[in-house]
């Protein structure tokens, strides 16, 4: 390792990865994990590291999206994903359609009917430093746009699409792999905090948001699980995802779930100039 690297903060126990170091917050820090003392990263070394990263990330994706039980903490997963993105950026020839950087979400479960999204459900782009944030702003302005930013809180739960016809909730679906998700309409209808009818709504409306479990509800659920001798959920995100994807809607109803709506995806007969306008419109419904 180079003198610029930080001390190891954690060790992976998975056989496919011997160890991994979080370096200082800089772009060259991530690459220092595969950099030789001469400062040159050989293609074969990069290819090997890319394959290791993809294996661990894909494994965690399956656990995260399909079983709601990831092994990695969020900061560990983010660090691995960031390293993979940087290696692929430096070596474009290593990018493949199957890479986890080229798609989002997981495979829809066989427990629920499948739903094909009319508009693909994408994931957010990450920024881990002020430099990356400034770089994003520069790219926006270089495209001839003078932006006014809307800053929202980031809530970790399960992404969900809600579709309304004439103000009535007709379908709710998870993101799945971004193209095909799971039909969780019955469970969403059991969540008190999600409106089943909207006033003054257009003929068709689709909003997207994050179904989450508030900390108070999470603590209550964990206490109940411990009393019953069951293993408690690892964190509120896993609890929210596991609760929403229950086969019995009555279980979902008792979990205290809520939703944070962050996007107006479709709105028949209406048009908006800014994201802020769409949020104001959603609040009016």
For each feature predicted by the language model, list its residue ranges.
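Intrinsic low-complexity, disordered N-terminal segments enriched in polar/charged/small residues
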Residues: 9-11
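Serine residues within intrinsically disordered or low-complexity segments
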Residues: 3-5, 26, 32, 38
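RNA/tRNA-interacting regions in translation and RNA-turnover enzymes
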Residues: 31-285
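Serine/threonine-rich, low-complexity intrinsically disordered segments
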Residues: 4, 13-15, 23-24
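Intrinsic, low-complexity polybasic segments
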Residues: 14, 29-30
